Amino acid sequence: MKNILLLTILSALFFACREDQEQKKEASKPSTTKLAQSGLGMVAAAQPLATAAGNSILEAGGNAADAAIATAFVLAVVEPTMNGIGGRNQILVRQADGSFVGYNGMTEVPASFVPAEEPPNAGYGTVATPGVVAALMRLHAEHGSMPWDELIKPAIQYASEGFEVLEGEAARHAYAL
């Protein structure tokens, strides 16, 4: 009886671990979708509308900082459960001379805030001021080349006219309800 049980378990493991030829064939097919290509730069984001907005800024003559700002604001509109202006960010810029500069868009508490001895679990003591917009504004001031209103125009358009909510974002909204 023990031998039959052992043989059954080993057989199940063998067949469960063997390679699925159909999945292998499907996975080995190259993608025929061209997502983005550029000789000077490109944008990649978690949401195609945000990627398109950043790439359109590059095509209009903007630089990487401009594209990052446009992309960030579109993400805040079209994928607010994962990206937004009400949170924090860190930005790393490689400058033309090869050096790096960082922008810390972390949340902060007011300078006059006196923390309690025990960290609060609820109430105003648990809330900090978002740093995303301040960091993006500083990035723009130091590296941007296009007017701010041009950079946020795509986000305003999607917020005003609407857009198709992708499946993952819809699922996150449904989960929150």
Predicted regions and their residues:
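Positively charged n-region of N-terminal signal peptides that target proteins for export
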Residues: 1-4
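C-terminal motif of bacterial Sec signal peptides marking the signal peptidase cleavage site
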Residues: 13-16
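Bacterial signal peptide processing site
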Residues: 18-20
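Noncatalytic scaffold domains of N-terminal-nucleophile
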Residues: 23-52, 64-65, 69-177
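Surface-exposed charged/polar residues within alpha-helices that form helix-capping/stabilizing sites
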Residues: 55-56
